[in-house]
Amino acid sequence: MGMSIKIRTILLERKMTIKMLAEKIGTTGNNLSNKLARDNFSEQELLEIAEALGCDYSASFTMRDTGKTI
């Protein structure tokens, strides 16, 4: 599942619009809509979005052969 789908799912659960989220992170609704369409976010943007949505965000890699998460 891409980040855009995850963000849109949380927006639905929080009863928020893209415009509302955009205002919270200091961008325009059009800019955020474009990023969601491309599923193209920097790590910093994801942290800001998570904070605005009242969520924790962590990025990690899990090795398939050992299950070790880095």
Task: List each model region and its residues.
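DNA major-groove recognition helix of helix-turn-helix/homeodomain DNA-binding modules
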Residues: 45-58
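Short, charged recognition helix plus adjacent turn
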Residues: 23, 60-70
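Polybasic/polar functional segments that serve as interface/processing modules
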Residues: 2-4, 24, 49
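Recognition helix of helix-turn-helix/homeodomain-like DNA-binding domains
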Residues: 26-41
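Short alpha-helical DNA-recognition segment
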Residues: 15-30
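A short, Lys/Arg-rich alpha-helix, primarily the initiator
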Residues: 1-16
